[in-house]
Amino acid sequence: MGSISMHITPSTALPIRHFRARVSCCSSGHVSFIKDVAATEPPMHLHHLLKVLQTRGETIISPGAKQGLIPLAIPLSKNSSGSVTALLRWPTAPPGMDMPVVEVWRSGVRLIARNVDEYIHRILVEEDAQELTELYRASGEAGEKLYEKGAFAESEIDNLDVYVLKKVGLFPDLLERKVLRHFDEGDHVSAMVTGEFYTKKDLFPGFGRPFVYYANILQKVGRNVEAKDAARVALRSPWWTLGCPYEEVASIAQWEDEQIEFIREKVSDEGRFEDLHKGKAPIQVALDVAAFLLDLASIEGTWSESLNHIAKCYEEAGLHHISNFVLYTD
């Protein structure tokens, strides 16, 4: 289908040295890390998700093993191909996206599930469709709460993806697969309707990927002006949420390097002074610079080189806990 692609799968904390002894690769280590280092409430069923991931063959890794990754990620597991599943700790979370499950890659993250519960639920449905039970047993009380075994078969819904979207939740890869299915059937109208639905602001807030995908759809059907507009909307989101290299989206948006140069100017001392001179609040300037630095690091793959500068911005914005979290590595 041309360029459309799928990838399945935004008070001062204690000194960081106080946390190291508490962090381990077990679920209690992840829970304490999220409470003490990430300074937020861990998902209720995180322990059960880790057990499920381990049971299906993934290696549970330390939440502090963030070297080379976007600093907002909390690693959970690594699969046999080296792909890392993580939680995303937003500095300021969009509504309904407090701690989504993501796949981490060089230039940022790809959204897997909006929350831990929906991810567990989906995994259990997909296992049940194969008439297996190992992951359900591993999920413990979370599985009993989230899914009743046999519900998929009893629903008489033939298509597993349709069941998950109706009964479990919305997942980016399933919506993208639905678009592909419509194109395979020659139904371009339904493909475009699904693509537009994917971009609804309350579905996956904070993520640019839906608009990238919609731009590809529009380009596929020859609506290049609308594709350009959709790509430009995508680039208003954090660039590390695009799900593909920045250059691919900038090409559809018909932008050269001017946007990158604009961002570089914004993070310079002169750019910060200019924003302050225009009356922007110092806290907002610091938050903007941190966001711009993350954008630039996602293009250049230089997360480690930007850590201190990003952390300093969050410190200046009064987000001391985020500053400590960003700097933390095992």
UniProtKB/Swiss-Prot annotation:
It is found in: Plastid, Chloroplast stroma. Involved in the assembly of the F(1) ATP synthase in chloroplast thylakoid membranes. Functions downstream of the CPN60 chaperones to promote assembly of the catalytically active core of the chloroplast ATP synthase. Assists the assembly of the ATP synthase gamma subunit into the active F(1) core downstream of CPN60-mediated folding, which is critical for the biogenesis of the chloroplast ATP synthase. Keywords: Chloroplast, Plastid, Transit peptide. Its main location: plastid. Residues 1-35 form a transit peptide. The gene is PAB. Disruption phenotype: Severe growth defects, and inability to flower and produce seeds. InterPro entries: PAB (IPR045287). GO terms for biological process: chloroplast proton-transporting ATP synthase complex assembly. This is Protein IN CHLOROPLAST ATPASE BIOGENESIS, chloroplastic. One of its GO terms (cellular component) is chloroplast stroma. Interacts with ATPC1.
